[in-house]
From Swiss-Prot:
Swiss-Prot/TrEMBL catalytic activity: S-ubiquitinyl-[E2 ubiquitin-conjugating enzyme]-L-cysteine + [acceptor protein]-L-lysine = [E2 ubiquitin-conjugating enzyme]-L-cysteine + N(6)-ubiquitinyl-[acceptor protein]-L-lysine
Protein name (Swiss-Prot/TrEMBL): E3 ubiquitin-protein ligase UPL7
Classification via PANTHER family: UBIQUITIN-PROTEIN LIGASE E3C (PTHR45700:SF2)
Region described as Disordered: 567-589
Name of encoding gene: UPL7
Domain HECT: from-to ranges: 794-1142
GO process annotations (BP): protein polyubiquitination
Organism, scientific name: Arabidopsis thaliana
Length: 1142
């Protein structure tokens, strides 16, 4: 560089070819990455070349060795020895087979031929009596020979695993592959059984056993891959076939070899290889779907043997987390993509139940040593696995597992088929003998040889089989059947539990000893015995739980005696009959406190064990309540006396109320569902035929009920999906409205309607008479037809105001203006005409109260179903406007409207004669074939008889003693459901156009009738007077008005009802008093000329009083004497005279 050179500065600016600093740095970075990539690519290419060269060299060497091997065996003339078999036959064979077939995962025809040759030589050597030639001699020879033998045998196990995976129907040379695999399995079975070795002696037997254990431990390890291969092989079997019988039997026999090594009582950390074999078996073999279906009967007997099941049970219990993790990882690795796939842990449950309970006699023969220990482990294993399965499927549902949004209907059908086959494996649990054997083993002390490091809880859980353990098992089964059984749900389990003799009584006795006070639920007990019965902690007292477990044996003695038909002993007899009805009546003391203190924390406040027991009881008893008739429930009082029914109802009422009030987690959902169902069934039975004090249902909410407006708001806001999980008063009023007094619920109903009217008014809808109201013209003689034609199509718009114009019989418009009163008259007239039996839409029940029920002949009338739907809207309009209609519906019909269950005994109010006949059939002691009944019912319409089958082929099915219950429920179902449902659905559609279904469900059937037609109590004259208006010159102080109220008080209750009907067209008072009568009760003055002496004996007014029912107006002349007013009023209200607007 020239230092003397003068530095020049360019003033021309930056050149377009120059780049910025950031761009230069980015360019340099990119070049650096390119160089790094080039280095990595070069290294990768060198590695690939190295691997390829290695592969080519090994393949070439393997081919050369194979050719030499084939030439050697084709012309060998040397004397065969064990060393020659090992070094010249087996060693090169294992090398080239591994290089040419195993690593390629494909078997060539040439290799199959080599395998056949090698295995035949090896089998010949093994069967030889010559120690110099027998391959097994190496196992008991020198240390070097035994190591060689073990190494080569392990490689044959690996080769066997490979061959098993290739035994699928897609293999071209499947028969040849099966043949060589059968040979190899036969060799391995001999090699793992030293007793079958021809060279075995007393001196070398220990060495042979040691060598055998080495191989068996390798088979049970993950390195061998044997259990994975057996799993893949069995899953390829579509069914059991004779051609694969040998290979299937041999493969499973070899897989069971590790179980026949001397086992400790529990899993032993000192024998990890043996433990691994059991883990592999549980996680890979027992998870095979429908395992039992693929195996021959001989193998099933082997798999269900105690020596196989017991170690499996121990491993699952003590290594639960590890086993479940292995199963989960296996599922992920297999990448199951089938829609609705059953989780693998579910198949473990199914396979264990199928193996342990192949038949009643096979469910652990009592002659086996320590059978109670087997039952303990069996129950704990099923519960452990079931809880894991339920945690996977209950949160999202089985249909959402591995969800494929493009799943077709065929995949859906396949998923249902898989679930049905899975449920079929659980069928033994639904048999009474299964429960009987578990109960027989419950409570017995069991001697357990436990590992000294085992946890205390594990030891304790395995010492006895208690009632709670069995309850947990069946509670889990109920939940599994709910999710997995697409057809019947939990019905198979519930049928068995419900009709098991004495089982439900024993469940309740166990619960009662823990949850309820011992001396009843009285106020004294609640105040003075709180220390004794309080439940301030999450779990029940240890003393009660211990007492429950210790007494479980005694409580099950009666159950087992009923199973076996044995007569109970004296003490047992006392316990068995202690729950029979006595002569005492139901205690109706108003001082009873039915709020159970121990359940005020809801499901969260009780232990998991008791919660499980409670869930099982609720589900089972709810199922039983469906079929219990009134004779059994009220007269015979089975399974419980009415006093205990009260305690059950109070317990459920408290549990559900506080569970909804405080909120519950997903883990309590099943308990709450079953408790709610059981509570509703008891409450509905009590509504129909009371057996509980009214205070019982109100008790939980007596101190915590919110204001009416608040309850209404929370009821409306709460989403349906959050009813059970979100703590709120809205949940309480939605699920258990009966804890609120009826009057308060009516207030809530009115609040709902007021809010709806306000929202409609804000939306611009018409809510009062005016120019924009709906206008209709109705002929007096055709009220129903004209109303149907003009109003049927407007749907929910019927909430708006209706302007009615009547046309008289002469065809002329009637005088007067409609300011709302004519709408009431229209509703009254249309219901009077449509509900008349002569019209044909409704008929009256044959009972004394003459309740309305849809007539079966209505379906044959023109527009019959549409007319009933229209009448639903008319009734909804009356409820919406607060107009009382003097009609009441059958409870069966209302139950359908409210979406509630109808008991078979409700048939007595619908068709008493049919009910008596069905009860006669139910309790008939002779042969029912003598009655010549079949599954049909005969209906008559217009003189024509038609026969309807109660089930397919019913006319050819005779009623017998075996199917009489099916016949009774089929007949009841026809009368209570099939015959009524089309009409109730139509009426419901119309009714809910105006009244929300949620509003209706605040009431029971009896209360619905009261809401529609008013209370059935006597009229409160003072309340009516306070809410009466006077027009035309009358006032409350007028002489005639004072006389009227004196006469009104002097009437009989029936006469007061007639007067009310004369004025309002309804004989009953509004539910919450005359304040809510619409329109308001009015007395209008009708001036009449009378003598001044009329008040003391002269001529009084002769004119009769009249009324305008459309305005609830009584037109009362100015009578001077009480006797005259009484006479004229009675004549008017009993004459049934017609009238027009005046």
């Amino acid at each position: 560089m020239d230092l003397n050179r003068k530095h020049k500065v360019s003033l021309r600016g930056a050149s377009s070819g120059e780049i910025s600093r950031d761009a230069l740095l980015a360019k340099v970075s990119q070049e650096r990455e390119l160089r790094s990539y080039a280095r990595r690519a070069n290294a990768a290419s060198l590695f690939i070349q190295r691997v390829w060269r290695s592969y080519i060299v090994r393949k070439k060497a393997a081919i050369e060795i194979q050719e030499e091997w084939e030439n050697l065996l084709s012309c060998h003339s040397v004397t065969l020895t064990k060393s020659w078999v090992s070094s010249r036959v087996l060693r090169p064979f294992l090398f080239f087979v591994r290089s040419l077939s195993v690593q390629h995962q494909k078997i060539q025809a040439r290799e199959i031929h080599c395998m056949q040759t090698c295995f035949k030589i090896l089998l010949e050597s093994i069967n030889s009596n010559d120690q110099g030639y027998n391959f097994c001699s190496l196992a008991v020879g020198t240390s070097e020979d035994s190591k060689t033998w073990a190494c080569q045998t392990r490689r044959m196990v690996s080769l066997c695993s490979f061959l098993l995976t290739e035994c699928n129907y897609s293999q071209e040379r499947i028969k040849d592959v099966i043949g060589v695999n059968a040979l190899l399995l036969r060799i391995l079975i001999v090699l793992t059984d030293p007793k079958s070795w021809k060279i075995i002696t007393n001196e070398n037997f220990e060495d042979a056993e040691t060598a055998k254990k080495i191989i068996i431990q390798f088979i049970g390890s993950c390195k061998s891959g044997y259990y994975s291969a057996v799993r893949r092989y069995i899953k390829t079997l579509t069914k059991h076939t004779d051609e694969r019988l040998v290979i299937t039997t041999s493969a499973v026999t070899l897989a069971l070899r590790p179980f026949h090594v001397k086992q400790p009582a529990f899993v032993d950390d000192n024998q990890p290889d043996t433990n691994l074999a059991v883990e592999e078996y549980v996680s890979l073999i027992l998870t095979i779907p429908r395992l039992v279906c693929y195996l021959p009967s001989a193998l099933i007997r082997a798999l269900k043997h105690k020596s196989i099941l017991m170690p499996s049970f121990h491993t699952i219990l003590l290594l639960k987390d590890k086993i479940l993790n292995i199963i989960s990882e296996m599922e992920n690795s297999e990448k199951q993509s089938c829609t609705m796939e059953i989780p693998s842990v579910g198949w473990v449950i199914g396979n264990i139940i199928s193996l342990a309970t192949v038949s009643e006699t096979d469910f652990m023969d009592p002659q086996e040593s320590n059978p109670e220990m087997f039952y303990v482990l069996y129950v704990h294993v099923i519960v452990t696995l079931a809880e894991n399965l339920l945690s996977q499927v209950e949160s999202v549902g089985i249909q959402d597992i591995h969800l494929d949004i493009e799943a077709t209907s065929n995949e859906t059908e396949k998923g249902n088929s898989v679930k049905i086959s899975f449920v079929e494996m659980l069928r033994p649990v639904c048999q009474q003998w299964h429960l009987a054997k578990l109960l027989a083993a419950s409570g017995k002390e069991i001697r357990v040889i436990a590992d000294k490091d085992a946890s205390t809880s594990s030891k304790k859980g395995s010492e006895t089989l208690g009632l709670l353990d069995i309850a947990r098992l069946y509670s889990c089964m109920l939940r599994i059947f709910c999710v997995m059984n697409p057809v019947l749900g939990p019905l198979p389990v519930l049928n068995m539990l419900s009709f098991c003799p004495g089982y439900i009584v024993s469940l309740w006795n166990s619960l009662e000893s823990v949850l309820l006070p011992e001396n009843g639920c009285t106020a004294d007990d609640a105040s003075h015995g709180s220390a004794k019965t309080s439940w301030n902690t999450r779990s029940p007292s240890e003393k009660k739980l211990k007492h429950l477990k210790n007494d479980s044996v005694n409580k099950w003695v009666n159950v087992l005696n009923k199973f076996s038909g044995k007569s109970p002993g004296p003490r047992e007899h006392v316990e068995c009959t202690s729950d029979q009805p006595g002569s005492g009546q139901v205690n109706e003391s108003t001082n009873d406190v039915w709020d159970v203190e121990t359940l005020r924390g809801g499901p969260v406040g009780i232990s998991k064990e008791v919660s499980c027991l409670l869930h099982l009881f609720c589900a089972t008893y709810a199922h039983l309540l469906v079929v219990l008739d009134d004779i059994q429930f009220y007269e015979k009082q089975v399974p419980f006396m009415l006093e205990k029914q009260q305690r059950i109802a109070s317990m459920l009422n408290t549990l559900v109320y506080y569970g909804l009030l405080r909120g519950t987690g997903p883990e309590s959902r099943q308990l709450m569902d079953s408790a709610i169902r059981c509570l509703h069934l008891l409450y509905e039975r009590d509504c129909r035929h009371p057996f509980c004090a009214s205070a019982l249902w109100l008790s939980p909410g007596r101190t915590s009920r919110p204001p009416i407006a608040f309850a209404a708001r929370t009821h409306e806001v709460l989403p349906t999906s959050d009813v059970l999980t979100t703590p709120s008063m809205g949940s309480v009023i939605t699920i258990t409205p009966h804890v609120f007094p009826f009057e308060e619920r009516v207030h809530v109903f009115r609040e709902f309607i007021s809010k709806d009217k306000a929202s409609r008014k804000m939306a611009g809808e018409v809510d009062a008479p005016g120019a924009r109201s709906i206008e209709i013209v109705v002929r007096r003689g055709h009220v129903v037809e004209d109303g149907f034609q003009q109003l049927n199509s407007i749907g929910s718009r019927l909430k708006s105001s209706i302007h009615v114009s009547f046309v008289n019989e002469s065809g002329l418009p009637e005088a007067g203006l409609d300011y709302g009163g004519l709408s009431k008259e229209f509703l009254t007239d249309i219901t009077k005409a449509a509900f008349a039996t002569e019209y044909g839409l409704f008929s009256q029940t044959p009972t004394s109260d003459r309740l309305l029920v849809p007539s079966p002949s209505a379906r044959h009338l023109e527009n019959g179903i549409q007319m009933i739907e229209f009448l639903g809207r008319i009734v909804g309009k009356a409820l919406y406007e607060g107009i009382l209609l003097d009609y009441s519906f059958s409870h069966v019909f209302i139950q359908k409207l409210l979406g509630r269950y109808s008991f078979i005994d409700e048939l007595s109010g619908l068709d008493p004669e049919l009910y008596r006949n069905l009860m006669y059939v139910k309790h008939y002691d002779g042969d029912l074939k003598e009655l010549c009944l079949d599954f049909t019912v005969t209906e008559e319409f217009c003189g024509k008889m038609s026969i309807i089958e109660l089930k397919p082929g019913g006319k050819d099915t005779s009623v017998t003693n075996e199917n009489k219950m099916q016949y009774i429920h089929a007949m009841a179902d026809y009368k209570l459901n099939r015959q009524i449902v089309p009409f109730s659905n139509a009426f419901y559609r119309g009714l809910t156009d105006l009244i929300s279904p949620a509003w209706l469900k605040l009431f029971n059937a009896h209360e619905f009738n009261q809401l529609l037609s008013g209370g059935n109590h006597d009229i409160d004259v003072d309340d009516l007077r306070r809410n009466t208006k006077y027009t035309g010159g009358y006032s409350d102080s007028s002489r005639t008005i004072k006389i009227f109220w004196e006469v009104m008080k002097g009437f009989e209750p029936s006469e007061r009802c007639l007067l009310l009907k004369f004025v309002t067209s309804c004989s009953r008072a509004p539910l919450l008093g005359f304040k809510y009568l619409q329109p308001t009760f009015i007395i209008h003055k009708v001036s009449c000329d009378t003598s001044l002496w009329a008040a003391i004996g002269g001529q009084d007014v002769e004119r009769l009083p009249s009324a305008s029912t459309c305005y609830n107006t009584l037109k009362l002349p100015t009578y001077k004497r009480a006797s005259t007013m009484r006479e004229k009023l009675l004549y008017a209200i009993t004459s049934n005279a017609g009238f027009e607007l005046s």
